[in-house]
Amino acid sequence: MVGPLTNRPQQQFGLPEYLTYCAAVGANPVITIATSVGNPNDAADLVEYLNAPANNSNPNGGTDWAALRSADGHTAPWNVVWFEYGNEEFNTPRSVEEYVSKYPLYQASMKAVAPNIKLGAVFDDSTNVKNGWTYTVLQRLGQKIDFGIVHPYLPKLNKDAALNTTPEQVKLAAISADADLVYRLDLYNSLIRQVTGRTDLALAVTEYNSLFVQDKPAPYRQTLVNALHNADYLRILLKPASNVLFANFWQFANSYWGMVTGFTHLGQTPVKQANHYVFALYNKYLGAHLVKMDTQSTPIDFSGGLGISPRIGVATTKSDPVTVPVPPDWSRRLFIDGSQSQANNVVTVNFNKNTDVNYYHAYKEFDAEPNTLYRVSVNVRTTDIKGGKIGIAVEDSRGWKEMHDQPANIFLTGTTPWTLVTVEYRTVADAKKMRLIARRISGEGSISGIAEFGAFSIEKITQNLGTVESVVGTASKSADGKELYLVLINKNLNNPVDTSIQINGNFRSVLAESLIGSSPLSTNLEAEKTDHVKIIPLLIREIKVGIVTIQLPASSVTGIKLARR
């Protein structure tokens, strides 16, 4: 990925080109350190290439990487600060024990070359904070890591689930995800303080978007309503209480996820998609300092689904857990890819057929209340597990094929003592029953070893996330305080909203623009129709000093600029 382009014909956009691009647009590069190949010395060599002076100092020995950087056309150090140790490691065959044992070695080697670099540690993508991957990382590395890495992809929908999901459900899920994001960030930050005692350990959201992995009936990831969703995510991530250092939208340019689509080397014209315009508006209408803003709007209800909690009624705080009495025995399905037995309410599974088995054959169903948070915990022990990870999952008893939502905590491998494994799950508005599942997910190759699933407990927690505010936004001001900026999101899918804005101070309206489309599901993907989603000017009226009015279009993101008189 470095050196002359002629020596890397299959990697024309390598490290030098990436860094040059970041410098050109004023972005701070974030570089992921591979965990599946290489070693700490390789990571130190990378830091030398990026940050060491080209003066023959060669701080890591061996190849003079700073000299190679200079030969690549950049004599001065790039001074890269931000690095990730791995990417979504909880989804790989590597164990959390391997991860926490190697992180300090990489961090020490890299900082020996450039002490100012920051190396982030991967947290898992879940609300499993009582134990599991994130808890172990914080417990073992909490005093060492420079920041925590999270990827809060919500809502979630794949092509199979899309067959049983209406476009209306998708649209409502997209505009209802903000409360779940706040809830998840709060869990991470609370866990950091609880386990490490640190108040200086922040989060980096190095990927975010919806997880709409489908194309029919519409590629929801590229729609206007998903742009509203991502604008809403930005609103949350900007809040100081979120404790987020930086955030990276997934992704900039790519034919599937990209906010800009079209391959120029194939003669295609780059086209700005709906998500691109969100960042164009924030870039233009976000000042240097946030300003407090209160909003009042007509609420929107959502019954829950696609990984998003129900949004009905008045928001309430989380109650103390109440234990739900459930008989201790497990139910079992026929299992032919190994053997399983139950004694003293412990299910023992022997993966002795050397297959890539999808295990879900021991389970427990129980009654559940609608719109309620449940915490399900199971004692699990593993013996010589190779080729995968063991844990538990929870779902609505209607099952994956109908609900397509199964939160899981799957992280045990090798030989482990009895370990309490916990999953949190919030039921949808029409829930009647839940299912606890002993789990191993296929796809990691043949598995061998023994897993035991023992005593479990189920706790009920009352908490309502409340209805969706239909109009939300961010207020900010310029560094000198002479300009005031607003970014307003109208989540009303089909109706414009006449909006009155009251401002403390003597400001006059200067400019207003809005991201709109012909419908919430509009995209710019059609070859001859690349302006279905676009930014248009809006009329803003001053009624009297301190009060302006504007009509926010349906399904829109609007930027407003005001200047002090």
Each predicted region: which residue ranges?
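A structural motif corresponding to the C-terminal end of an alpha-helix
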Residues: 14-29, 109-116, 144, 187-200, ...
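Conserved, mostly hydrophobic/aromatic
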Residues: 22, 46, 83, 148, ...
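Surface-exposed beta-strand/loop patches in extracellular or lumenal glycoproteins
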Residues: 493-506
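Extracellular and organelle-lumenal recognition/adhesion modules and their flexible linkers in secreted
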Residues: 8, 118, 289-470, 474-481, ...
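N-terminal catalytic cores of secreted or lumenal carbohydrate-active enzymes
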Residues: 1-160
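Short, well-ordered beta-strand segments enriched in hydrophobic/aromatic residues
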Residues: 482-492
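Noncatalytic carbohydrate-binding groove/subsite architecture in carbohydrate-active enzymes
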Residues: 49-50, 95-234, 240, 299-302
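Aromatic/acidic polysaccharide-binding cleft in carbohydrate-active enzymes
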Residues: 204-309, 466-470
